[in-house]
Amino acid sequence: MFPESVPEGQRFRLTEEDRRFLYRYMSMLPRESVEPAYPDREAYPDSYVKLLLFGDSGDPITGHVRLFNKVGQAYGYLIDNAYVVDFEAGVEFLLTAVLQVNQNRIYNDDQYEYDEVGLPFMARLGRAVYRFELQRERARRPDLSRFRVHD
C-alpha cells in the first residue's frame, strides 16, 4: 500500500500500472467485478468481502469509503486486514482483526458462529475505529488521490 515506506532496494518491482491494478482489485466490491461477475446482490452484497465496518449489512457501500483489504474465513476464524479510506472526510487507517467464532471448539464440523457473532463484531469494531478516526485531530489532511482507482 505504501511502497515509499520501504527502502527502494527492498521494494517489489511494481510499475504504476501494477500498483493501480492491485489497489483496484483490493478495493473492488462484488458488484464492480466483471470477471468473474457477481450479479446476485443478495448472495454477494457489497459487504461480502468487506467485513470491517460493513460485515453485518447487506446495504450498498457508498463510494466515498473504500476498504483495500483481504479477508479470510475458515474453521471458525474470520480475518479482515484493511486499509480504510474516506475520501470525503480525509480519514485513513489500517486495521487487522482475527476472530475465532467456534463456541463448541470442534474444528471442521461446520458449526461456527460467523453470522451470529463474527460478522456483527467485525462490523462494530470497524465502525468504532472509524468513528474515533473521524474525531481525531490531525496535523494535516492526507493525500488520498493515489487510491482513487474506481470511476
Predicted regions and their residues:
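Structured C-terminal helix/loop/strand segments within mature extracytoplasmic catalytic/sensor domains
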Residues: 1-151
